[in-house]
Amino acid sequence: MYKTKGGFQLTLQTLSLVVGFMAWSIIAPLMPFIKQDVNVTEGQISIILAIPVILGSVLRVPFGYLTNIVGAKWVFFTSFIVLLFPIFFLGQAQTPGMLMASGFFLGVGGAIFSVGVTSVPKYFPKEKVGLANGIYGMGNIGTAVSSFLAPPIAGIIGWQTTVRSYLIIIALFALIMFIFGDTQERKIKVPLMAQMKTLSKNYKLYYLSYWYFITFGAFVAFGIFLPNYLVNHFGIDKVDAGIRSGVFIALATFLRPIGGILGDKFNAVKVLMIDFVIMIIGAVILGISDHIALFTVGCLTISICAGIGNGLIFKLVPSYFSNEAGSANGIVSMMGGLGGFFPPLVITYVANLTGSSHLAFIFLAVFGCIALFTMRHLYQKEYGSLKHS
């Protein structure tokens, strides 16, 4: 089963996540083109870029729960059908309001993340769950696909036509999921309120949510603000900015399975502590950098640590919450998504207030330091002293 049905469903769901994230992230790499045709202020741009994260985060909880009730096939299929509408209207957008409304419903593409992290572990033994979820998480590469491909294509055929071309891809995957999705997936029908009551009493859920708020939040936030930030702050060409942003996203995505593998082989909490120490260093580098070379080093450091951290955290979630996996996955992934909503707004606010965005990156380092204290607390409660482990 693990080599046949499980492998096939892992591949299918990973590719579906790629498509979902392509749609979810389509606005950010095209914003340098969009703002040439649509009259938007920098403040409106920061809101437009952040809006898809809202629904993409909040829906992760019900999507995770529904996956255990009806199976991944039907949640993916329905999501793709729904995504056709905001993609179509985004291609017609002529006002900031139309961009915001379309972007809000594009959040469905980000919400499907919790579908696979709930479904995929059912097909694999416990010692392979970290790797399997890490591979599924590579579907985040859809964000990089949009960052790499959308700007050069938009330069040739225009941003509206580029957006509308996504309709074909999404419709195709709706059909593929309808035909090949697993109708025999194991269902777990624990009442939602019973799950929530159990989860609310477990401090580990709060810790994992906070950690993922930082790691996945950094992944999403940097993917959102980098294209526009690089153009405005460093004067980089629009296509080059998209490529640089794509490198950040791709690196974090491809390292996610490495985090899962490390979590399978070593103590995941201990590895995560090391990961966060390095991430804090990267955030400090960003907080003091005015040169593109140093800024690049800081970004790549954050990318590496965010990718590995994402994989480590979703090794821990199913191991701590086997009976409430769907809801726990949804809550943790929701917090990760929300972690990507606030930073672009904070960066814009801090830049307007102080004339520089450096302080916003220092905030990331502070949040990371707080996370280290919570990791130490969990480790000592679960495994004993760090000195004797």
Curated annotation (Swiss-Prot):
Listed Pfam families: MFS_1
Any GO BP annotation: nitrate assimilation
Keyword field: Cell membrane, Membrane, Nitrate assimilation, Transmembrane, Transmembrane helix, Transport
Keyword Metal-binding included in the entry's annotation: no
Gene Ontology molecular function, alphabetical: nitrate transmembrane transporter activity
CDD domains the UniProt entry points to: MFS_NRT2_like (cd17341)
Broad class of where this protein is predominantly found: membrane
Induction: Positively regulated by the two-component system NreB/NreC.
Function: Probably required for nitrate uptake under anoxic conditions. Also possibly involved in excretion of nitrite produced by the dissimilatory reduction of nitrate.
Family: Belongs to the major facilitator superfamily. Nitrate/nitrite porter (TC 2.A.1.8) family.
Official protein name in the record: Probable nitrate transporter NarT
Species this protein is from: Staphylococcus aureus (strain MRSA252)
Primary gene name: narT
